[in-house]
């Protein structure tokens, strides 16, 4: 089954080492199995797999809604890292989606300035958060807004710190 191949590949790589693979988070594996099956029945989910012979080396989950596709998740066999299986799958997926007359746009769902996706998919959608107060002049809105800004700053700072620590560790 394609979802099992994806889950195994994702868990075998860096996501598995960091404990963030779907099969490692309680309930996530069961949820993704049910969700992909239900969405696939309606033509709204594809699991694509790149193989070297019979060996799966990369797999991704693509979600579809109306005329848009979303490259939701990617898992790779890091034993094949020197061949860039994630990039190879993304390139093949790009050709596939560009040839699909029903798809007008694709979202990588990657973070801004993602090192793998940016050189391949250069276009960007402007996406933002909107906070809508339910009561006029609600003071809670300003506090929530400040908390969201603080969270974003903390995440960026933490990511930078992790990057620096990894660079120091690899020296």
Where on the chain are the PLM-derived regions?
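A structural signal for short secondary-structure junctions
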Residues: 41-42, 55, 63-66, 88, ...
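Active-site/acyl-donor-binding loops of N-acyltransferases
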Residues: 98-169
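A sequence-level detector of short, solvent-exposed, charge-rich linear segments
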Residues: 22-29, 33, 51-54, 58, ...
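Short glycine/serine- and small hydrophobic-enriched flexible loop segments
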Residues: 34-37, 92-99
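A conserved beta-strand-loop-helix scaffold within acyl/acetyltransferase catalytic domains
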Residues: 1-82, 170
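Conserved acetyl-CoA-binding loop-helix of GNAT-fold acetyltransferases
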Residues: 82-95
């Amino acid at each position: 089954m394609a979802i099992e191949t994806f889950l195994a590949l994702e868990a075998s790589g860096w996501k598995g080492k960091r404990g963030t693979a779907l099969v490692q988070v309680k309930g996530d594996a069961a949820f993704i199995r049910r969700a992909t099956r239900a969405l696939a029945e309606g033509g709204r989910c594809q699991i694509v797999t790149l193989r070297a012979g019979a060996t799966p080396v990369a797999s991704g989950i693509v979600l579809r809604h109306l005329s848009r596709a979303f490259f939701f998740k990617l898992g790779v066999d890091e034993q094949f890292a020197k061949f860039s299986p994630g990039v190879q799958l993304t390139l093949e997926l790009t050709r596939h989606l560009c040839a699909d007359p029903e798809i007008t746009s694709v979202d990588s769902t990657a973070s801004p300035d993602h090192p793998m996706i940016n050189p391949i998919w250069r276009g960007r959608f402007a996406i933002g958060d909107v906070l809508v107060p339910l009561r006029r002049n609600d003071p809670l809105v300003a506090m929530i807004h400040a908390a969201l800004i603080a969270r974003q700053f903390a995440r960026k700072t933490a990511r930078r710190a992790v990057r620096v620590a990894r660079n120091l560790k690899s020296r």
